[in-house]
């Protein structure tokens, strides 16, 4: 039986080689040629590009437990996070205005791959040291103290004057 299997393997290998098969090993992919594209959503009608990055358990916990972590935290953390963000090849991210965030959440269907059903910070001030947040399910705005924690989604302009060269 062992001889039969060995003979069959030898016969198939010989046939493959005679038929013009190529048994050369697959070349390894160079690290510089592997590309992971960051997800974004582009609103072409208003020239805005939105960060569409996965939310982590730590960020979910930050909102629930009132602390800062990545794309979740206080208003000051949100401003700092967006200003220092390098994502999708760009570094000119900012916290959206309430009008911008409401606009994107009024589009039919869920435009973001990664989303949360909780409030998101905006850069628009209200009164009494509060800022507007937008609840994505209904695109309504609400007032929140800067010390409260909410989710963060950064935005950037995509107009001709705002393009970076990579």
Language-model-detected regions and their locations in the chain:
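Glycine-aromatic-enriched surface loops/turns that form tight recognition elements
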Residues: 2-5, 16-94, 98-166
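Sec-dependent N-terminal signal peptides
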Residues: 6-10
